[in-house]
Curated annotation (Swiss-Prot):
Coiled coil: none annotated. The lineage of its organism: Eukaryota, Metazoa, Ecdysozoa, Arthropoda, Chelicerata. GO terms for molecular function: ion channel inhibitor activity; toxin activity. It comes from the Eukaryota. It comes from Cyriopagopus hainanus (Chinese bird spider). This is U3-theraphotoxin-Hhn1i. Residues 1-24 form the signal peptide.
Length: 87
């Protein structure tokens, strides 16, 4: 009887240890994609978009005029490509 109790205790302790190890490795794996994405999409000062006098594609055109090749959508007030049905 004692041997069965000891084996049950060891089995339970092993399962708890396995759970703790799996949880720790999973939490590290969750942080890895966040770190990878933040390093890929980190904005460097050299690559920041310069302020323009005109608004580009899908930019708000209430205060700024659209850049050449785009027209201001009357409904959404965004700069969009000119199309025959928008003329």
């Amino acid at each position: 009887m004692v041997n069965m109790e000891a084996s049950m205790f060891l089995t339970f302790a092993g399962l708890v240890l396995l759970f703790v190890v799996c949880y720790a490795s999973e939490s590290e794996e969750k942080e890895f994609p966040k770190e990878m994405l933040s390093s890929i999409f980190a904005v460097d000062n050299d690559f920041k978009q310069e302020e323009r006098d005109c608004a580009g594609y899908m930019r708000e055109c209430k205060e700024k005029l659209c850049c050449s090749g785009y027209v201001c959508s009357s409904g959404w007030k965004w700069c969009v490509l000119p199309a025959p049905w928008r003329r």
